[in-house]
């Protein structure tokens, strides 16, 4: 059985992972889904992105935890400038995401995670 934790590298998810390691809980892999602003620029605050890649990921890897970084083919800019394809607002620009109906969450985070989940063995937790 493979044990995977999803991680945003915020205080809560990172604390959960560190506590699991400290208490000997099984943990084979950590999955982080990075939302990109455009094809080259991360949507993360630059200091947080630096922390993730130069401190957090190397620290987990030193403890024997594989870290997988996922990214969507779509970016924030793609969604912001994309056109609505159906409904009464068909043809209008999507522009700013709306809370509760956020295409960024759906297309830039959830889809890559679900795609990755389908590639895993069925007994993955």
Where are these regions (language model features)?
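ATP-dependent adenylation/nucleotidyltransferase module used to activate substrates
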Residues: 1-125
